[in-house]
């Protein structure tokens, strides 16, 4: 018996050795330098996950602007020269940008693939987004968000001039989640108290689910996180079509998705709901921390606060809008919102400092990638990745890059600045918190408008102060690097009280 175990042990050891010898990838002629790491399958994943920016900078110094890293069994080619970003996008015919995103969505939210090539639906989700997040549809969505933000902030509760102290991130989370949920998925006009309780419960479920999202993207099954799994199922239950049909003022995006799910897909009721949950997550997970950073940096800079207040007051005066809790809600149209370069610059600068997105494309076939730094052979199923935080924090492009400068995106005429340089050359891509090319976030225009609306209302309705007048900027939560806007590692206490009572 012992002999048999020895034989099986030797066979297993030989198989492992053969796998290590034959399965290890070797760099071929014309390919980028290869950093495989020392842990089978994981490769460099632990080092990358601990601090992506430091990891990529170290490899950039070691290998140059283009190098390959093994991450979770995948070979990822990082392009770190911002002057080459537009060259990468010119190779679009060789990329499958949908594969990674559709696979990740199905894995994280628990529905079958929404890629039409997999046969579960014939809906082109990108066309759906383009129809409902631009043009007239964007106008109605933005108007609804302004109304719902004020519904949330101007809640008909006893008001006083007393200061209210709260964590700023918690405040932004609560307000933006509630207003955003109502904007996308509608309201129950006859059950306000029940709706409020439902939203608050959904908020807690969303936090539990979102907490494990980086692990789900990394490939871990949600069933090992029972609390998060239960939270996901409860969120999806509230987004079933039977429940949505009882609500009024559902956004055009969700109405169209409901129709297409019902007519073009083979999804069951729960799977349809989970495709809506994916939209809920996409609309909140980055917007909430982006809102926090915009409010935090605006308040922390006296110059930014003064310039923003003057711009908001002028916009309201020009639009003949009165600030009054008992009067009509504030309304600014799309043109008026777009003509606020100071707020635009504050938001852009806040996102520049907090964005850590990973722009990913999968190679459909073997091809040669031609860049400013040379040409490189890429294998089928390899991943091309851009990490714009390298560019956003490059001192040559953005002098003193770790300092918030509210007017960084304003030119000498106080209009939006669009000209930035690297190595004396004008950059085509200099600001990329929303991705790029075919993978650019379809909801980016709405996201900017809702953050801007939030700032307008906070400046209009409230007096704002930090509890600690010498508050320091909280560190970024690196556990979410690669997913978009990084939240603060700790909350910051602030206080607010109503004006004009």
Swiss-Prot record:
Tissue: Detected in liver.
Entry's EC annotation: 1.14.14.26, 1.14.14.23
PROSITE patterns assigned to the protein according to its UniProt record, in alphabetical order: CYTOCHROME_P450
Pathway participation: Lipid metabolism; bile acid biosynthesis; Steroid metabolism; cholesterol degradation
Subcellular location: Endoplasmic reticulum membrane; Microsome membrane
SUPFAM superfamilies: Cytochrome P450
Keywords: Cholesterol metabolism, Endoplasmic reticulum, Heme, Iron, Lipid metabolism, Membrane, Metal-binding, Microsome, Monooxygenase, Oxidoreductase, Steroid metabolism, Sterol metabolism, Transmembrane, Transmembrane helix
Main location: endoplasmic reticulum
Cofactor: heme
Alphabetized Gene3D superfamilies for the sequence: Cytochrome P450
Domain of life (superkingdom): Eukaryota
Molecular-function GO term, any one: cholesterol 7-alpha-monooxygenase activity
Keyword Calcium applies: no
Annotated membrane topology: Single-pass membrane protein
TM annotation in the entry: 4-24
Enzyme's top EC category: oxidoreductase
GO biological process, one term: cholesterol homeostasis
Catalytic activity: cholesterol + reduced [NADPH--hemoprotein reductase] + O2 = 7alpha-hydroxycholesterol + oxidized [NADPH--hemoprotein reductase] + H2O + H(+); 4beta-hydroxycholesterol + reduced [NADPH--hemoprotein reductase] + O2 = 4beta,7alpha-dihydroxycholesterol + oxidized [NADPH--hemoprotein reductase] + H2O + H(+); lathosterol + reduced [NADPH--hemoprotein reductase] + O2 = 7alpha,8alpha-epoxy-5alpha-cholestan-3beta-ol + oxidized [NADPH--hemoprotein reductase] + H2O + H(+); lathosterol + reduced [NADPH--hemoprotein reductase] + O2 = 5alpha-cholestan-7-oxo-3beta-ol + oxidized [NADPH--hemoprotein reductase] + H2O + H(+)
The UniProt record lists the keyword Transmembrane helix: yes
Assigned protein family: Belongs to the cytochrome P450 family.
Biological role stated in the UniProt entry: A cytochrome P450 monooxygenase involved in the metabolism of endogenous cholesterol and its oxygenated derivatives (oxysterols). Mechanistically, uses molecular oxygen inserting one oxygen atom into a substrate, and reducing the second into a water molecule, with two electrons provided by NADPH via cytochrome P450 reductase (CPR; NADPH-ferrihemoprotein reductase). Functions as a critical regulatory enzyme of bile acid biosynthesis and cholesterol homeostasis.
Protein name in UniProt: Cytochrome P450 7A1
């Amino acid at each position: 018996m012992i002999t048999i175990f020895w034989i099986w042990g030797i066979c297993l050891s030989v198989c492992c050795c053969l796998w290590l010898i034959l399965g290890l990838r070797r760099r071929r002629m014309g390919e980028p330098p290869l950093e495989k790491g020392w842990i089978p399958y994981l490769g460099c994943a632990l080092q990358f996950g601990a601090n992506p920016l430091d990891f990529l900078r170290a490899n950039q110094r070691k290998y140059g602007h283009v190098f390959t890293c093994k991450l979770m069994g995948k070979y990822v080619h990082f392009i770190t020269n911002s002057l080459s970003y537009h060259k990468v996008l010119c190779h679009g015919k060789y990329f499958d940008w949908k594969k990674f995103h559709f696979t990740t969505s199905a894995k994280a939210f628990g529905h079958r693939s929404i890629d039409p090539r997999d046969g579960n639906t014939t809906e082109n989700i990108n066309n759906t987004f383009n129809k409902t997040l631009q043009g007239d549809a964007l106008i109605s969505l933005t108007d609804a968000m302004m109304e719902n933000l004020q519904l949330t902030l101007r809640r008909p509760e006893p008001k006083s001039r007393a200061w209210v102290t709260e964590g700023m991130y918690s405040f932004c989370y609560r307000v933006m989640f509630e207003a955003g949920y109502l904007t996308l998925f509608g309201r129950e006009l006859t059950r306000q108290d029940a709706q409020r309780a439902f939203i608050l419960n959904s908020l807690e479920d969303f936090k539990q689910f979102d907490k494990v999202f980086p692990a789900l993207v990394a490939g871990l099954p949600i069933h090992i996180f029972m609390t998060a799994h239960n939270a996901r199922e409860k969120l999806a239950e509230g987004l079933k079509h039977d429940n949505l049909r009882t609500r009024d003022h559902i956004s055009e995006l969700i109405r169209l998705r409901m129709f297409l799910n019902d007519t073009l897909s083979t999804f069951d009721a729960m799977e349809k709901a989970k495709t809506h949950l994916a939209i809920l997550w996409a609309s909140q997970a980055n917007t909430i921390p982006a809102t926090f950073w915009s409010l935090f940096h605006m308040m922390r800079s006296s110059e930014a606060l003064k310039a923003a207040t003057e711009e908001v007051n002028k916009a309201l005066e020009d639009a003949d809008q009165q600030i009054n809790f008992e009067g009509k809600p504030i309304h600014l149209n799309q043109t008026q919102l777009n003509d606020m370069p100071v707020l635009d610059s504050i938001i852009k600068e806040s996102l520049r400092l907090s964005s850590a997105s990973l722009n990913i494309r999968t190679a459909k076939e073997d091809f040669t990638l031609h860049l400013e730094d040379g040409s490189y052979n890429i294998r089928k199923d390899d991943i091309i990745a851009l990490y714009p935080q390298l560019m956003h924090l490059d001192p040559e492009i953005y002098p003193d890059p770790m300092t918030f400068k509210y007017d960084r995106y304003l030119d000498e005429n106080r209009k939006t600045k669009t000209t930035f340089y690297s190595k004396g050359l004008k950059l085509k891509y200099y600001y990329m918190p929303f991705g790029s090319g075919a993978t650019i976030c379809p909801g980016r225009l709405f996201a900017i408008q809702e953050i801007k609306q939030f700032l307008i209302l906070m400046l209009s309705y409230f007096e704002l102060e930090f509890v600690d007048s010498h508050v320091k900027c909280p560190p970024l939560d690196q556990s979410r690097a690669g997913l978009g806007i990084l939240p603060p590692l700790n909350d910051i206490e602030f206080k607010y009280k109503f004006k004009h009572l």
